[in-house]
Design a protein with these regions (language model features):
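Active-site-adjacent structural elements that line small-molecule/cofactor binding pockets in enzymes
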Residues: 1-296
Length: 296
């Protein structure tokens, strides 16, 4: 199992630089973060964040992280893909992957904040169908010399993109919401099974281990039904060290290992204690669980 950590919501670039270098030195395999472009003041934030928490723009931050680190995988969790034109997102992702030496794992999701979507000209009711067309378009732009798309939401007439990435950039999808306890709805499971390289579990689901195990089996069954090999489909579970007693960290990692998940993301997004406190807690986590990680 490959284990990574989240970048806390530090606003200062010096703090970001110190944290990501420290996390890389601790041996984490991947570094994740999420985004919002704008915050809707009238929308309740169900995840404990506030509209004035600092959210960095994903691709700008990825460029900074690519220049700051040397080894760790850069993992968006998630890029709200419908907020961007497919061609622009394809170009940005290709550039980041090229400039980072092939270290991008692109996590995408449809988003939930309707005020944010409307501010960027996106119809919330079509965001799922839009994301599907975006993903297929982006892969075509990364792969093909000339691309034509005649979709409902994306239309291209004989365009090409250079430079193209030197590999197929993995695209993972999120799914689930607070109303369902993080369990992904059936349309989302079907979309992931058809189009994604992996599933990034929504954090609340990681607190209900039985529900998480059932959801994993459901996703794997859908991947199999789509004619794909579930063993080649990645699954990233979550663990929040600040919400799980320290004496239970090892047992929680053992649980995810037994379920056969490919990745684990260690969530610490608030970063209220500062860089040193966050890295100290992560160091304790590494010392307790490192023997269960996949070796590079």
């Amino acid at each position: 199992m490959r284990v990574g950590c989240d970048l806390p919501y530090f606003e200062d670039p010096g703090e970001i630089r110190a944290f990501v270098r420290g996390a890389e030195e601790l041996g984490f395999h991947h570094l994740g973060f999420s985004e919002h472009v704008v915050s809707g003041r009238g929308t309740p934030y169900p995840d404990g964040f506030a509209p004035d928490d600092p959210w960095h723009e994903s691709f700008t931050l990825l460029g900074f992280l690519a220049a700051t680190t040397t080894r760790v995988e850069l993992n968006t969790a998630m890029v709200l893909l419908p907020l961007r034109p497919a061609v622009l997102a394809a170009k940005q992702a290709a550039e980041i992957d090229l400039l980072s030496g092939g270290r991008l794992r692109l996590g995408v999701a449809v988003g939930w904040n309707r005020e944010e979507m409307r501010a960027l000209g996106v119809d919330p009711s079509t965001r799922g169908a839009l994301l599907e067309e975006q993903v297929t378009t982006m892969r075509a732009l990364w792969r093909d010399d000339v691309v034509d798309v005649d979709g409902v939401h994306v239309r291209l007439d004989g365009v090409s993109m250079h430079p193209r990435p030197r590999r197929a950039i993995p695209i993972w999808m999120g799914g689930g919401n607070f109303a369902t306890g993080g369990v992904p709805p059936t349309p989302v499971v079907d979309r992931m099974a058809r189009l994604a390289d992996g599933w990034k579990m929504f954090a609340p689901l990681s607190f209900d281990l039985d529900a998480a195990a059932a959801a994993i089996e459901r996703v794997r069954a859908a991947v199999r039904a789509a004619g794909r090999d579930p063993d080649s489909f990645g699954i990233e579970a979550r663990l929040a060290p600040q919400a799980v007693p320290e004496e239970d960290w090892l047992a929680r990692v053992e649980y995810w290992t037994a379920l056969g998940v490919s990745h684990l993301g260690v969530a610490n997004r608030k970063g209220a204690g500062g860089v040193d406190a966050e890295l100290e807690r992560l160091a304790r986590f590494v010392n307790a669980t490192r023997h269960l990680w996949t070796e590079d």
